[in-house]
Curated annotation (Swiss-Prot):
SUPFAM superfamilies: Class II aaRS and biotin synthetases. Pathway: Amino-acid biosynthesis; L-histidine biosynthesis; L-histidine from 5-phospho-alpha-D-ribose 1-diphosphate: step 1/9. It is found in: Cytoplasm. The gene is hisZ. Pfam families: tRNA-synt_His (PF13393). It comes from the Bacteria. The keyword Isomerase does not apply. PANTHER family: ATP PHOSPHORIBOSYLTRANSFERASE REGULATORY SUBUNIT, HISTIDYL-TRNA SYNTHETASE. This is ATP phosphoribosyltransferase regulatory subunit. Belongs to the class-II aminoacyl-tRNA synthetase family. HisZ subfamily. One of its GO terms (cellular component) is cytoplasm. Heteromultimer composed of HisG and HisZ subunits. GO terms for biological process: histidyl-tRNA aminoacylation; L-histidine biosynthetic process.
Amino acid sequence: MNLNKNLPTGTRDKLFREARASYQIEQQVNHYFAKRGFKRIETPVIEFEDVFSSEHQADAKLYRFFDEKGRLTVLRPDMTLPIGRVVSTTGVTLPLKLSYSGKIFRANEDFGGEQNEQTQAGIEIIGYPSIKAEIECILSGIGVLNALEIPNFQIELGHAAIYRRVIHLLNLPETAEMDFRLLIQNKSLTGIQQFVTENPSTLDDFILALPRLFGPATTILKQAKNLTTDKGILTALTEMETIVDAVSYAADISVDLGLVQDFHYYTGIIFRGYADLAADNFLSGGRYDHLLEQFTSSSSPAVGLALNLDSLTTLQNRAGIIKKQTPTTLLIHYDLDAIQQAEKLMQETPNSELSFFETPINAISFAKKWQIPTVVHVARDSIQTIFHKEAE
């Protein structure tokens, strides 16, 4: 079967207005991060599979292929681990504030509706153990969304240590842990009730309430503190309160104590961004203090934020924010011996472009088709208007 007119699953073409909007959003985001003092970093699209083996092998969402030496390589499925590789192998001095943008690739299942190719941008704050790193990440995300004029967005906080603490105290085998993870992610009330019956513990009240522990930050955090005496969970809740107090002036903040990230490297505060016009989150991040241990014997505190720029482009389009490209108002048809004069006229005239047609008639036909109001003919010794819409 010849597939030369088809696209691989989960990929798509972007034309004209959408392509320009995607490019402009990426520029805006990078400019905003640079203004906040982040240093840009770029990593290859192709990496050895070992860079991602601990996080992605189980879910098999990698695009794998062999290089010319028979080594297994992949298209990067995220940016965080490659940046961890760079930081741990180049000897750069910490702490660091890094920013990035580029393509990521995930081999999702067919018919799932997910995009396998995504444009992602984000930041990594490495070497700062202070909670100010989380605050900076969240405020940077809020600032970007405001700069992009995303309407009615909300930031949702969670804490990876809550789920980790529950799993640790329950001491579940791997298969049971995976089942429990799905119950929490799906907020299955009946499923969790059955789980608690089969796995009783001192956390029963807290676990039973987890599917409902989401909503207004202050209310939910206060409610959660009354459901447990476990010091680990209480410490995480207090940390969330500190973050909420620090950033709630900038945006609407909610919490979800059953928030579980797909990547297992998160260790502390986690967060997501939602909006009324978006079906899913377009912003995610959190703290992962053991990230560098995959590449070196030492660890370093780190917090990161990632933005799905394709989703943000769609959001802008739905909100009517994407501006139309300034239309061409002058088409310059020229004789070959008058290219210098034509080029000079184009450089001096805003919203003008050169005609590539052999005859003035074809140039005028093109102008009518694309609603260009004026066409001039540049000869070596003259410039003549040969079409003007009002005089048609």
